[in-house]
Amino acid sequence: IENSLEAKTNSLGQFIVLSGIHGEIYKDLVLPKQYTLFQNYPNPFNPVTNFAFDLPEQGYVTLVVYDIMGREITRIFDGDLGGGYYKFNWDGKHRSGTMPASGVYFYQLTANDFRQTKKMLIIK
């Protein structure tokens, strides 16, 4: 993931700042009623995939990719987010900048007391 800084305003004139991520935040929609981690797409993928999730309330959020042995590959997001729908993309690279081997990987969303993990497949 490339480092970046982006600022936007929503229809209410509120500033939204994204730092170090490529993602989209949909703040103007009605707040979700529950936490939801959606299946990444495309899946299988090479080299880019997208992650999306719903947060019903503000909280500290991590979105992390792990290999089949449970080793952390990269952190897609690590910080505070308000309630809403979020979408992030991943270029398929290890945090060191290298491409992981083809195979099964897992991504995990943790937010407040919610934790969910899903499976994905990298192909080359």
Identify the residue ranges that each predicted region occupies:
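Proteolytic cleavage junctions
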Residues: 1-36, 42
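Surface-exposed coil/turn segments at beta-strand junctions on protein surfaces, enriched
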Residues: 8-10, 30, 44, 56, ...
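Surface-exposed loop/turn motifs at beta-strand-loop junctions within extracellular Ig-like
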Residues: 11, 21, 67, 94, ...
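Glycine-centered coil/turn sites that cap beta-strands in beta-rich domains
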Residues: 24-41, 45-67, 75, 87-90, ...
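Short, surface-exposed loop/turn motifs with a glycine/proline- and acidic-biased composition
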Residues: 77-113
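Extracellular and select intracellular beta-sandwich modules with Ser/Thr-enriched
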Residues: 114-118
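Short beta-strand edge segments in extracellular beta-sheet folds
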Residues: 120-124
